[in-house]
Amino acid sequence: MRKIAIIGAMAEEVERLASHLENRQTRQHAGSTFHSGHLHGVEVVILQSGIGKVNAAVGTTQLLEAYQPDAVINTGSAGGFGVDLDVGDVVISSEVRHHDVDAVVFGYEYGQVPQMPAAYAPDPHLVNVARECIEGLGELRVAEGLICTGDIFMADKAAVDQARERFPSMLAAEMEAAAIAQTCHLYGCPFVVIRALSDIAGKESDLSFQAFIEKAATHSAMMVEAMVKRLGTAS
């Protein structure tokens, strides 16, 4: 691949990768920050979108229009929902859904935006590359499954229980991925979501998030950097 885009919501989620760019250039527009340069010989643009679905969609649209990448990797932190998952574990998306959209009365699935797919499937090649990179990162525990998105931080037990009931197979919840996936779907751009867990949903999530965001950001960045290197070698 000639050009890879990486998207994270917060500075903590993108700065490690951005600091490794050669010939780094930074620009800001409409609330989004773009870092461009080369990583392991691959042309890369890194977007810090801001938190939440609207910020993610706006930033991703700007990114796709201005830079026209061959693929998008969404990285950063998430809250874990899988019973066997722990802080620092990495989740690769098998599919991505909204968990806070309700148009069921019109015949849509819960979580489905009208006239859009109920779930967004990541690019199989990008998922395979992510799997291959796991072998070289022995210290990371990695799972693959459903990642759900909503404009809510999962610290409330009632919200956590409701999400578990509606999406029993969900491994991770966060606040941007489905908006990024939906935008990529509309533009026909391949994507994958790679998230490291900063907290386990419902278990003092607000406290553990602050304590472990750096660990989660480091683990997700390690995975993404390994993917960029492998994708560059294969191109």
Swiss-Prot record:
Pathway: Amino-acid biosynthesis; L-methionine biosynthesis via salvage pathway; S-methyl-5-thio-alpha-D-ribose 1-phosphate from S-methyl-5'-thioadenosine (hydrolase route): step 1/2
Protein name (Swiss-Prot/TrEMBL): 5'-methylthioadenosine/S-adenosylhomocysteine nucleosidase
Gene Ontology biological process: L-methionine salvage from methylthioadenosine; L-methionine salvage from S-adenosylmethionine; nucleoside catabolic process
Binding site for substrate: 79, 154, 175-176
Molecular functions per Gene Ontology: adenosylhomocysteine nucleosidase activity; methylthioadenosine nucleosidase activity
Keywords: Amino-acid biosynthesis, Hydrolase, Methionine biosynthesis
Broad enzyme group: hydrolase
Function according to Swiss-Prot or TrEMBL: Catalyzes the irreversible cleavage of the glycosidic bond in both 5'-methylthioadenosine (MTA) and S-adenosylhomocysteine (SAH/AdoHcy) to adenine and the corresponding thioribose, 5'-methylthioribose and S-ribosylhomocysteine, respectively. Also cleaves 5'-deoxyadenosine, a toxic by-product of radical S-adenosylmethionine (SAM) enzymes, into 5-deoxyribose and adenine.
UniProt-listed Enzyme Commission number(s): 3.2.2.9
Active site: 13 (proton acceptor), 199 (proton donor)
Pfam families per UniProt: PNP_UDP_1
Catalytic activity: S-adenosyl-L-homocysteine + H2O = S-(5-deoxy-D-ribos-5-yl)-L-homocysteine + adenine; S-methyl-5'-thioadenosine + H2O = 5-(methylsulfanyl)-D-ribose + adenine; 5'-deoxyadenosine + H2O = 5-deoxy-D-ribose + adenine
Keyword Hydrolase applies: yes
Family affiliation: Belongs to the PNP/UDP phosphorylase family. MtnN subfamily.
Entries under InterPro entries matching the protein: MTA_SAH_Nsdase, Nucleoside_phosphorylase_d, Nucleoside_phosphorylase_sf
Highest rank taxon of the organism: Bacteria
Gene: mtnN
Record Gene3D superfamilies: Nucleoside phosphorylase domain (3.40.50.1580)
SUPFAM superfamilies xref list: Purine and uridine phosphorylases (SSF53167)
Key word Cytoplasm present: no
GO terms under cellular component: cytosol
NCBIfam families registered for this protein in UniProt: MTA_SAH-Nsdase, PRK05584.1
